[in-house]
Amino acid sequence: MEATLSMKISGRNKFKGKVINIVPGIVTAEVEIDMGNGNIVAGVITKRSLEDLQIKQGDELTALIKATSVMFIKE
């Protein structure tokens, strides 16, 4: 069964893109997404988050960017 969540978030800078590269480490992973027009954003997330969200190359993600962090959402 798949659950759908509706939520409000405080992050105002939201960018959708496609995963173009994943560099897994022991504890963290760097994820790069291409937002089009040559715009690429990279963020570091825990390896557990990478596995829990089942993020893989080619997936569509939303990057939430705040002054101190970058978060990814997989819809």
Regions flagged by a language model, labelled:
Residues M1-E75:
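Non-catalytic connector elements of ABC transporters
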